[in-house]
From Swiss-Prot:
InterPro entries, alphabetized: Cystatin_dom (IPR000010), Cystatin_sf (IPR046350), Prot_inh_cystat_CS (IPR018073)
Protein name according to UniProt: Salivary cystatin-L
Lineage, top ranks: Eukaryota, Metazoa, Ecdysozoa, Arthropoda, Chelicerata
GO cellular component: cytoplasm; extracellular space; vesicle
GO MF term list: cysteine-type endopeptidase inhibitor activity
Task of the protein: Inhibitor of cysteine proteinases. Inhibits host immune responses via its inhibition of host cathepsins. Contributes to the suppression of the host's immune response to tick salivary proteins and is important for successful feeding on hosts. Inhibits differentiation of host dendritic cells. Inhibits proliferation of host T-cells in response to antigen stimulus. Down-regulates TLR2-mediated host responses to infection by B.burgdorferi and the production of the chemokine CCL3 by host dendritic cells.
Organism: Ixodes scapularis (Black-legged tick)
SMART domains found in the cross-reference section: CY (SM00043)
Cystatin domain segment(s): 30-117
Keyword Secreted: yes
Length: 133
């Protein structure tokens, strides 16, 4: 009887975690625009990705962070939805979020990126996809 009760409690707890998105899924972060960590991750992902694109001459930069979701794994996955645009900074320069501003005539694109941050603090861009302008 005790083991049946424990099993029911365990299964109920798993069901609650799955239903609320706590168990392995992404959770949306409220007040993401007030958190400078998310903006820094967005700039890291955008500048890293744009520097690796063949034929590009300028970095892309973040115009706006639209949405942030996190997933706890062996570290944290940050799924960021962004508005990005080509910046005034050439790829031959060093990217700086304060000086690499969007070009006045640049088209803004909506992009989704996933940045993985390990438990040791190392970051990498897992994916970066944009809708057509």
């Amino acid at each position: 009887m005790t083991s049946s009760f424990a099993l029911v409690l365990l299964l109920g707890g798993v069901a609650v975690c799955v239903a609320t998105g706590v168990f392995g899924g992404y959770s949306e972060r409220a007040n993401h625009q007030a958190n400078p960590e998310f903006l820094n991750l967005a700039h890291y992902a955008t500048s890293t990705w744009s520097a690796q694109q063949p034929g590009k001459t300028h970095f892309d930069t973040v115009a706006e962070v639209l949405k942030v979701e996190t997933q706890v794994v062996a570290g944290t996955n940050y799924r960021l939805t962004l508005k990005v645009a080509e910046s005034t900074c050439e790829l031959t320069s060093t990217y700086n979020k304060d000086t690499c501003l969007p070009k006045a005539d640049a088209a803004h694109r909506t992009c989704t990126t996933v940045v993985f941050e390990s438990l040791q603090g190392d970051k990498s861009v897992s994916s970066f996809e944009c809708e057509a302008a």
